[in-house]
Design a protein with these regions (language model features):
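Hydrophobic membrane-insertion alpha-helices, especially the h-region
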Residues: 1-4
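Generic alpha-helical secondary structure signal
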Residues: 6-7, 145
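N-terminal leader regions that mediate targeting or early regulatory function
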Residues: 11-12
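N-terminal Sec/ER secretory leader and immediately downstream segment
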Residues: 15-118
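Extended amphipathic alpha-helical interaction segments
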Residues: 121-198
Length: 198
């Protein structure tokens, strides 16, 4: 019962889109706040399942790990798009843009627990540790906006840049789905279609 019951209890895919994230200051970015909220929801409010080893009951879960990886990938792409248009911190040559740091942390592989399989089982920072760091960087950037340390003046060109990057991400996701359908639609069973979907 350990694996089926434990997996059933852990399994939690939140597809609700009806979120209103309150801002403490109108100068803050709602997009950054929402991105931080979603990452926090998947990493802290839930159990992060993609990196757990076989002795956790979530090891045999299929859709939830794929969903969580997809949410982090979307958060990374959103932060990357914002980093292209949002101003850096003052003295940017000496201080890294906190959005750039958040992007780097969110692009970290989501399957690292205590050791990296890609690096001969050498101890490595866990995925959750890196994603929590990303949350802090996103929140600090919004705090800098609120304090007036960073001033963002929206321009039409900024929206165009964000929409172009977002459109490119959606196109790649659509191509992945089309490829899966094209290559496996004639199969009796396709165990990866749901993973690609999520």
């Amino acid at each position: 019962l350990y694996y089926p019951l434990g997996g059933w209890i852990i399994n939690d895919i939140d597809t609700n889109t009806d979120y209103e994230i309150p801002l403490s200051d109108p100068k803050q970015s709602a997009t950054i706040a929402t991105t931080s909220y979603i990452v926090n929801r998947e990493v802290n409010d839930k159990l992060w399942t993609p990196n757990l080893p076989f002795f956790f009951p979530s090891y045999f879960l299929d859709n939830m790990p794929s969903f969580q990886l997809g949410m982090i990938n979307t958060a990374a792409n959103t932060a990357l798009a914002l980093s292209r248009v949002m101003p850096p911190l003052p003295d940017g040559e000496n201080k890294p843009n906190r959005l750039d740091t958040a992007v780097e942390m969110l692009q970290y592989p989501g399957t690292v627990w205590l050791f990296s399989l890609e690096n001969n089982l050498v101890p490595a920072p866990s995925s959750t540790k890196q994603y929590r760091r990303a949350i802090r960087q996103l929140n600090k950037y919004n705090q800098a906006l609120s304090a007036g340390i960073i001033v963002f003046t929206p321009r039409a060109g900024d929206l165009k840049t964000i929409l172009a990057l977002t459109g490119g991400n959606l196109k790649r996701a659509n191509l992945d789905l089309e490829k899966q359908i094209r290559e496996f639609s004639s199969s009796w069973f396709d165990g990866k279609a749901d993973n690609v979907f999520y």
